[in-house]
Structures are given as C-alpha cells and as structure tokens.
Swiss-Prot record:
It comes from the Bacteria. Member of a network of 50S ribosomal subunit biogenesis factors which assembles along the 30S-50S interface, preventing incorrect 23S rRNA structures from forming. Promotes peptidyl transferase center (PTC) maturation. The lineage of its organism: Bacteria, Pseudomonadati, Pseudomonadota, Gammaproteobacteria, Enterobacterales. One of its GO terms (molecular function) is rRNA binding. This is Dual-action ribosomal maturation protein DarP.
C-alpha cells in the first residue's frame, strides 16, 4: 500500500513542534532600533564620565579601551566609535553598568543635598550663634566648640565690615569635614 501525501508528513522525526513552552516572541524592528539607540546613549554617558568615575563601573577590558578611545576622538570618528560601543553593549549584560552609573549619579545628588544642608547650618551658626552651636554639638559630639565659636565670631565681624567671607567658608569646610568623618 502506498502512503497518501498527508501520511508522509506524520513520519517526520522531531515532529513535536506543538510544544507550548517554546513560544516564539516576536520583537518589532522599531523596538530593536529603540533598544540599540538606548544602548548608544548609555555608551555616550559612559564616554562623558571621567577616569575616576569609570574606575567605579564594572567594564571589561575591550569595552573600557573603546570608551577611552572615544574620549580622545573628535567629530565624526567619535560618532562611529559611539556606535561601536553601543554594539559592544548589546552583546553584554548592561544591568550592572546601569546600576553603577545610577549609583554615581545618585551619589552626586546626595552630595549636593548635603552641601545645601551644611550651607543652611553655617548661615544659622552665623545668625543664631550659641543656640546653633549646641545643635552642631548634638549632631557631631566630637566637634571643637572653641574653634566653632571663634570662626563664628570672625564671620560676624567680616559680615559687618563688608569683607570677603573667609571665616564663613572655613565654617563650611569644618562642617563638611565633620560630616565626612561621620560617614
């Protein structure tokens, strides 16, 4: 008996394609382009970082070399190098790189907020005097009360005499040192 044309398809080995676990996920060409563009922007952010900041980001040697080369290149060559960096990033897990970059950006924002708080505290020290000194001593018990009072007194004299705020800057520096030594 000869097989019918439909019957010969049933005997093909590996004919268990109907497995529902192997779903094919279709990704649009536009989405692929958006992802590539996003990785190119990430690469540009990495190129804009300084050497010290780059040291804090987990990069392998060839990606690091490509970034350092892009930092030295100007104009059209830089654009092509950024495209290469984007291509290299597509072949890697970029999540650790993104997390390290976010951490760097967040650290900068936290530092700006801290500086604003210290400036406000410095201004209160100059205006309020001993009441604000007590607050500083509760925040940082190891602070030198005598040095603070001397700096405050000098800052008030400079302010009254319309002189440059040298002592006010010194108060800020001292408060910043206290905050850095604490953390």
């Amino acid at each position: 008996m000869t097989k019918q044309p439909e019957d010969w398809l049933d005997d093909v080995p590996g004919d268990d394609i109907e497995d529902e676990d192997d779903e094919i996920i279709w990704v649009s060409k536009s989405e692929i382009k958006r992802d590539a563009e996003e990785l190119k922007r990430l690469g540009a952010e990495l190129v804009d970082l300084g050497k010290n900041a780059l040291d804090k980001i987990p990069l392998d040697a060839d990606l690091r070399d490509a970034i350092e080369l892009a930092q030295r290149i100007k104009m059209e060559g830089r654009r092509r190098q950024l495209q290469l960096i984007g291509k290299m990033l597509r072949q890697r897990d970029v999540e650790p790189i993104r997390q390290a970059l976010d951490k760097l950006k967040n650290r900068h924002n936290q530092q700006v907020v801290l500086f604003h708080k210290l400036e406000h505290l410095r201004d209160r020290l100059i205006v309020e005097g001993d009441d604000a000194v007590v607050e500083v001593l509760t925040l940082w018990p190891h602070a030198d009360r005598q040095q603070l009072r001397s700096l405050i007194r000098n800052a008030k004299k400079e302010k009254e005499g319309n002189k440059p705020p040298k002592s006010a800057r010194q108060i800020f520096q001292y408060l910043r040192e206290l905050a850095e030594n604490e953390g």
